[in-house]
Swiss-Prot record:
Transmembrane segments: none annotated. GO terms for biological process: astral microtubule depolymerization; cell division; mitotic spindle assembly. This is Protein stu-1. Residues 659-668 have a biased composition (Pro residues). It comes from Neurospora crassa (strain ATCC 24698 / 74-OR23-1A / CBS 708.71 / DSM 1257 / FGSC 987). It is found in: Nucleus; Cytoplasm, Cytoskeleton, Spindle; Cytoplasm, Cytoskeleton. It holds the Pfam family CLASP_N. Residues 595-622, 701-716 have a biased composition (Low complexity). The lineage of its organism: Eukaryota, Fungi, Dikarya, Ascomycota, Pezizomycotina.
Amino acid sequence: MAERITDEQVADLLAILRTDASVDAKANRITAVKTSIKQHNVPATCFAPLFEALHIASTAQHPVLVNAGFTTLNHLLARLARQDPKFLAKEAPHTLPVVVDKLGDQKDKFRQIAVQALTTLYKVAPVDVERSVRNIAMVGKNPRAKEMSMHWLLQTHQEQGLQFRAYVPTLMELLEDADGSVRDVAKTTVIELFKNAPNTAKSDLKRQLKNFKVRPAIEQVIVKELNNPSSSVSSHQNDMMDLDEPVMPTRAPAPASIRTNLSASVPTLASERPLTPGLDSRPEPVEPQFVNTQRELDDIFRDMHMFFDGRETEQNWLKREESMTKLRRLIAGNAVSDFHDSFLAALRALLDGIIKAVTSLRTSLSKEGCALVQDIATAYGPGMDPMVEILMQTFVKLCAATKKISSAQANATINTILGKVSYTNRLMQHIWMACQDKNVQPRLYATEWLTTMLTKMAHHKNQVEHTGGLDLIEKCIKKGLADANPGVREKMRATYWTFSGIWPARATHIMNELDLTAQKLLQKDPHNPNAHSRTETGGARPGMGLSKSVMGAPKPSVRDAIIAQKRAMASSKNQPPRPGSAMAHFSPVGTTRNVSSTSQASVASASTASAVPAPTKSAFGASSGGLSGAPMRPGKRRPEVAARPATAGPYSVRNEVPPAEPASPPSKPRIKTVTSPKTQTLVISPKKAIPRPQQGHSTNSSESGIPIPVSGISSPTKPTSAFGLRSPRSPLAPELPPSSVIASPSRVMPDPAQIPLPESSPSKDEELSLVVPGSVLPTQKTPSPTEESQQPQIAIVPIEAVEIVPDSPYRSVQVYEDPYTAGQTQPQSTYTSPVLEPKPVNEGAATSPPPQPSYDGENGHDMGEIPIPSSPERTRQNSRLLDSGISKVETKSLDVHGFRKLQGIIRDPKGGAIFTDDKFNALLSGLFEFLEAHPSEIPHVPAEKQQDVKAQILATIKLLLKKMRENFRPHVSRGLDSLLRARAAYDSRSHIVSGMELLADELITLGDPTEITLVLANTLREALLDKDQQHNTAARSLSMGMHVLKEVVESSANSSTPFTPTEQELDTLAGLAAKCLESADSAVRMDAVQLCVALHAKVGDQRFWDAVKREGVRDDPKSLITYYIVRRQREVGTNA
């Protein structure tokens, strides 16, 4: 252990350092002194000579001596800071030059020791240290010294609270330093120093950046980082790692060949150009800009006002556009949240300038002005009501502009305003004026505005009816349906059906006033929910099969179709005429029509089976089939232009006994199945026709690759009950007696487009062949006459056996081997017998068919379906994700993305087994508590995202209700109670309110009316007690509670267990209604009146008025209730 340092040792060290002794000897002496300093206190008499000796060593030229001396000096400073800080404070001015000089040393070790020495000296002499750093290190010429001094400044500020205001001018100069690394360090230092500074300091920093003319790139980075503190700290996304894992794989995009074929079924309007892409009227997103003080916000608006004075010129138009963009950036930033009222007042003061920008002839300036108004409407909603009148006048006028961009932007802006602001009758008057405009554009846009208003006010019909808006809506619809422009009429038909869903009686009256042609067009509109043509399927279209040889084929054009038809006609002329005897024969192989060469790419051919070839339709001809799914009258048969070839099949199948001479085989040899000639099978096969031009009446059929389940027809060879795609290798079908063959006098097969499939099938246009054995048909349920009349008459033609491999519509699509490539690997038989020789069909099939699986026609799947078991790994993953989601729901920390992952787990058909009763109850209880939680009780979710989280909670509850309806039944009352409590936090104009009301209406049909009435009565009594303290929130809960109780009373009339209130329940409901009739809120009073009307209709006149009398309702509310009761009785009598 080293001994304590002595005066003689220090004197010897000082003497040897002044001589020419070797460097090693000097370094050894200094090391010995350093060891003593580290272990023992230093005598006071040694302070001064020891500092002198270490100064000499630290400033020497040899690096070994410098290393030993400077490290010893650092230890000496640390020792004296604890032993004698007063002496160290006196010695600091002499030692600081050496330390500051080492801040710029080439070696990083010495620079780090210098920072430590400065930190030690700052504790005893802060003024001297700050002066040396600020006036020497930071303004010197050494870039390393500048960097280290800024590091020391930041470290000292974070650890010891150093006030850095005096360093700001120096930092501003360092931001423009010639050295790039110095600029980067200065930028980082400024950001870290001002990150947690008050708003006034940040505002001063922005002014300093402007005053020192810091380059814009650096200024923007600093301001952006200061305005977004979350970007500089690590986010908490790792907490959601459990729920961020993918649950379901994303679906790959459809191939290009399939996407091109999808356009074949889209109807084309005469007033539209479907090939021209529409204008994108959505505003472009902007970078947010943040303000820190009210003074800074006032300065921004004060500078803007001068740009909007006078007329638009070449000098100020760009400043106006930049001002619009800056206002949008402020809205995207914190101006709305931190300076809500003052920012709105400043916008109102600048409204004249905003209108000048909107009406500018410069498209970019007008576009920015429209985007600004949309952002204001989205951010403030009803808060911008005072500005709506002048804005509506401006934008309605702008919609008639000749510039398409300006017109489309004005239309989008009006749509946004109508969807966000409060409803007034003036808005409907603006729409009515637009419907009467001489230009077609405002009339066309008015249909969209009217749809927006109808969608928004669907749940607030009373407000529209009492202000005269309903009459204006009817006038607008009548005017649009009779408009001279076909595009306006087409758009107004869609609006009419939206109106019909809200006021059906009024809509029926409007339709009755139209002429017959207009009524037919209105009923055939695709937006008509009652149109049957939308649920019927069209025929399979080219390219929709799963065969890679078919899917890879390009879509043939109309020109190819014409050429193919001409070739078929020319080839038919060169063939000898067909014998008359061949016309009357019935081919057991399958009757075919004249098929052109272009239709040979049909998917009906397989390796071991073939379907009936579909007829080829001319590009300009009519056919009984096609892409339209609606039943239609068959077109006239075209006259024969040439004699039919001798080997062609008959035109139709006649009711005759099958002859011994069959028709000629197809042109290409196929693999034959050796079967009995007596066996015949019913086959339904979609045709493959040449595409033709779109027709106005063609339906928009869905194009999908999912198998189609068909009710009542099952596979004869497999006992499984789900339907799927047909297998390329089909086993033999069972025998069918000849008596089961039914021939059609007009055609062999009905067009697949005219065969309606069940509504439960997930896809409409699939290649599907159905095999129904005749031996099974007698064992099936005998259809009623009504069912027989609804089923199409399908001709049964003999054909080679084709089998359907059952599968569930929810399973993933299985892609089988291409029949064309699969056929190459199998030995093909050669026809050695004459062409017209009788062929054995389906011989040797099974004699006893397997039992038929039970089929659920309502749900569209088999009752005996057994789901594919999921893998243990998948089950464990889902279970872990579910547990994580439940825990985060209970702690109210689950965000929007987490809820979406949770919904994916619930939707997973293979993940339902992980939902035990305990997990289901825990999840549902947590969701209800999360839903009704006050915003202050959800600290983990930002305030601006809480409404989105609540919307996801509603979506999750609805999904649980849909998937596990019976498990949900005990929680109905609790759910309605949570909805009422959550309703108190949101205004009626909020989009989440409509979701709450829809969920409440669905829960009513599931729960017990008596229990619901008891629970809601207790909740509403609490709301009535809180009315004085929180009037607005209590009124919202009361309004929704009255509505729910009214629905309980009314909906029970249509249920299997009607609800008749007892005397006690009637008194409870009447008492609540009586108290709500005294409310200061008009919506609460109106809902209470509606509840009274429903009670009167339910319990009768005598019981109702007795209950009202017992509750002591005043005369004025009684008169109002009587008025609405009489009004309802009249409406019921009129509808009856």
